[in-house]
Amino acid sequence: RLPAAPAVFRAPFQRLIEKMLSPDVWTYWRHVSTGNGPMNKSLGELPPQWNPVHDDNIMYSAYIQSMALLYHYLFDDPKYAQPGALTFKIEPLYWGDGGESFEYDEKSLNQRLYWQMVEKGYLGIACEPNCVFQICNQPAILGFRMHDLVYGGSIAEEVTEGYKQAWSEFGITRENGHFNILVMEKEHELLEPPPQGWADFWLGSLINMWNPEIVKSNFPAQIAHWRRDAPEGSMWIEPSVKPEGFGPPLTHAYDFGWAAVCASEVGDADSLDRLLKYADMFMDPVWDNGAYFYPRRDGWFDDQGRLAAMDPHTGNALLGYARLNVPDGLNKLYNNPLTKAHFAQPALVDMSEGI
């Protein structure tokens, strides 16, 4: 949408990358890198790591990689190709003896992720130690494709072919048509929790960019399994309620939000319309300073037993993404490269603040 108005998106894109580079976002890794949790206890307690992109932590490192390369590709701007353009820096006042600083750019970060992927046999890079999630590796694949489009090469093709072969041992999907979620790296074993709606729709939304056949062959049964009918033709998605004692007892609408995104990506306009209708009828949408969003609301269900929960991730991002996306949006981004002719067309390339 708005292909001739890059100025509308350029500054917000830069601010989002700057926010992602803030230590408030990435310093959690020092704690998570020590492991010794329910799914990585076999590794024992590991030494803490400050560098948030050198090993594992793919959910964070891949978003930085793909965002920087996507910025370069969409705006034809090598801003993050400069040495040190992606620097992770913390300067504490009362501890740390000078702090920590890790300098990268879009090329060196892409190379680091590529070699990790190779070292792991293309199965994927772990998020938390020992936990290789299918979902979390998809943004890295998008980043590899953007790198290919900007600099040439075929990294994305190599990685996706290797990924399919590596996951053939476990299955990208289960026999029942739901997506597998993660493999424990040390044990080389598939963890098989009950199917999760968010996992089906989150992975489906992303992997559609390079493997649309597996998504579109399974989405109809997945949406039929998770949807619940609601008044006036609307519908909601059965939420994945964590067992007691497994993480903080927070409520959310991730399953609902990712179902909307996936419906938009696969072109299921009927499901998308029904989900958005439910959100507008029952999720208390708000207009504030030009922004339309759904405010946080705790508690899983209303007094009718229907989904009531809302969280910032869903209310601020996922439902907006679902509204703005076009059918096969990520797939087209991945497979239909912009040409030099696109950038030669007249365009709005700059604008004043506040417009």
Describe each PLM feature range.
Residues A4, Y151-G152, V266-D270:
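Short helix-adjacent coil turns
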